[in-house]
Swiss-Prot record:
One of its GO terms (molecular function) is phosphomethylpyrimidine kinase activity. Catalyzes the phosphorylation of hydroxymethylpyrimidine phosphate (HMP-P) to HMP-PP, and of HMP to HMP-P. Keywords: ATP-binding, Kinase, Nucleotide-binding, Thiamine biosynthesis, Transferase. GO terms for biological process: thiamine biosynthetic process; thiamine diphosphate biosynthetic process. It comes from Staphylococcus aureus (strain MSSA476). This is Hydroxymethylpyrimidine/phosphomethylpyrimidine kinase. InterPro entries: HMP/HMP-P_kinase_dom, PM/HMP-P_kinase-1, Ribokinase-like. Pfam families: Phos_pyr_kin.
Length: 276
């Protein structure tokens, strides 16, 4: 039996399964990768919004990471919601010890409902502790604005933001997601690396059920990097995956429902049992 590749997510929770660690693990599974999860925050949230947040002490995060890394090494790592500077420093310690492992940052700052998930001091700390270590960062437009300080209202500003990530912050790659711009029927994303800029376009689906799209998108990139894919290939797969997951949303909950993490499997005919 061939051992599966392993992807590790370090993020907050969502008891309704649409975002955070829960969404990441489902996305890993759908990509054929074994998922592991370290919890940073217990988040009481649902499709209607965020009700309560309980950030774990950084020592508890350290204990979880120690359990993982003392037993096995993941082939790729992603971080999502990290609400305190101490926890960022804890995670940085492990990343510095394993610099060869691909690292993806989903800089979770706002919930889909608009609720803030990170204070200003922690946002500043993110730029100095984790972003310079990232193989790729996956901000949406509001997150890119928060990190760069720009008002991104044009393609020119997106290009400027991308250069800030690469040339000033020091990230190896960044994909700025244009899904929050409702100006066109096309969702256009921009991948920046030291080699230049590449764009990805997909149809924009008119639906409110997009809870957890950022988590899912970055998780698929992480899973594909764990399998040894090149960054461009990983992003290309993630774009197809997220488009299908939005197109076939399960319409769960009374608010902004989650995407369908198993739509890609269904399309490929790999998981017919899920519908039984």
């Amino acid at each position: 039996m061939i051992k599966p590749k392993i992807a590790l997510t370090i993020a907050g929770t969502d008891p309704t399964g649409g975002a955070g660690v829960m969404a990441d693990l489902k996305s890993f599974h759908s990509c054929g990768v074994y998922g592991m999860g370290v919890v940073t925050s217990i988040v009481a949230q649902n499709t209607l919004g965020v009700q309560h947040i309980h950030n774990l002490n950084h020592q508890w995060v350290d204990e979880q990471l120690d359990s993982v890394f003392n037993d096995t090494l993941p082939h790729a790592i992603k971080t999502g919601m990290i609400a305190t500077a101490d926890t960022m420093e804890t995670i940085r310690h492990y990343l510095m010890q394993h610099e060869s492992i691909p690292y993806v940052i989903d800089p979770v700052m706002l919930a889909k409902s608009g609720d803030s998930l990170m204070d200003n001091d922690t946002k500043q700390n993110l730029q100095h502790t984790l972003l310079p270590l990232a193989d790729v960062v996956t901000p949406n437009l509001p997150e890119a604005e928060e990190i760069t300080g720009l008002t991104i209202d044009s393609e020119e500003k997106i290009m400027q933001a991308g250069r800030i990530f690469i040339n000033e912050i020091g990230s190896k790659g960044v994909i700025i997601k244009g899904g929050h711009s409702n100006d066109t029927d096309i969702a256009k994303d921009y991948l920046f690396t030291n080699e230049g800029v590449q764009t990805f376009e997909n149809e924009r689906f008119k639906t409110k059920h997009t809870h957890g799209t950022g988590c899912t998108f970055s998780a698929v990139i992480t899973a594909e990097l764990a399998k040894g894919r090149r960054l461009f290939e990983a992003v290309h797969k993630a774009k197809k995956f997220i488009s299908m997951s939005i197109q076939y949303t399960p319409e769960i909950g009374r608010g902004r429902g989650p995407v369908n993490h198993f739509a890609y499997l269904k399309k490929e005919g790999l998981d017919d049992e899920l519908s039984k």
